[in-house]
Amino acid sequence: MNNTVLILKKISKHYKQGNTIVKVLDDLNLTANEGELIAIIGSSGSGKSTLLHIAGLLDKPTNGQVIIPNSKYKKYHLIRLYYLGFIYQQHHLLKDFTALENVIIPRLIRGLDQKEAIRDATKILDDLGLEKKLYNMPGELSGGEQQRVAIARSLINKPRIILADEPTGNLDPKSTNEVFNLFLKVAQKQNTTVIMVTHNHELAHKMDKLYNLKNGLLNIA
């Protein structure tokens, strides 16, 4: 039986708009297990990114609990650092750092050994097909290659959970499938849980579970 790595319990997120209360998320529940691949689809403005921000402890719900079972850390910034990885549509690579340097930054922030970080980053970049691009600057890489570097960066700390918000949204169809398949391969190799928000239904159907976010609730799609 898989270990549970994330529980969203009765999550609500409400905003005040004039005299009206807008319910973006409304008593929502989600359980994610170790190694699971979960996709969340929904129309624009349905609250997908809000849900991901709450799951990633980047935003607080109006009501409800975000539970990381068996976490030895209580402070949110430590949970994010040690247990969570993030991938966004915009990769936010540092332009004056090589691909390899961009990937090892999260490991160095934790004060871990640089040689070990370089070794692990090199292996992940190799798994993502970038073994010949380690010392290239981001400006020398294609859009797909830049996104693979961002994916490698999210994986370097071997997070329990990766939260991906439209991770291939800026790529052409060929690059999208190539990057996404490599991403899933490496995530599964590390037994990392992936929760991905996407508008791409083809990618969504490659995941273990598919949910549709509508009217503030998650429904099995």
Swiss-Prot record:
Keywords, comma-separated and alphabetical: ATP-binding, Cell inner membrane, Cell membrane, Membrane, Nucleotide-binding, Translocase, Transport
EC number(s) recorded for this UniProt protein: 7.6.2.-
Residues annotated as domain ABC transporter: 6-220
GO cellular component, one term: plasma membrane
Binding residues annotated for ATP, in chain numbering: 42-49
Pfam families membership: ABC_tran
UniProt superkingdom: Bacteria
UniProt xrefs under SUPFAM superfamilies: P-loop containing nucleoside triphosphate hydrolases (SSF52540)
Subcellular location(s) of the protein: Cell inner membrane
GO molecular function: ATP binding; ATP hydrolysis activity
EC category: translocase
First-listed, main subcellular location of the protein, grouped into a coarse class: membrane
Recorded topology in the membrane: Peripheral membrane protein
Functional description taken from the UniProt entry: Part of the ABC transporter complex LolCDE involved in the translocation of mature outer membrane-directed lipoproteins, from the inner membrane to the periplasmic chaperone, LolA. Responsible for the formation of the LolA-lipoprotein complex in an ATP-dependent manner.
Assembly and oligomerization: The complex is composed of two ATP-binding proteins (LolD) and two transmembrane proteins (LolC and LolE).
Family of this protein: Belongs to the ABC transporter superfamily. Lipoprotein translocase (TC 3.A.1.125) family.
Protein name: Lipoprotein-releasing system ATP-binding protein LolD
Species whose genome carries this gene: Rickettsia typhi (strain ATCC VR-144 / Wilmington)
Gene: lolD
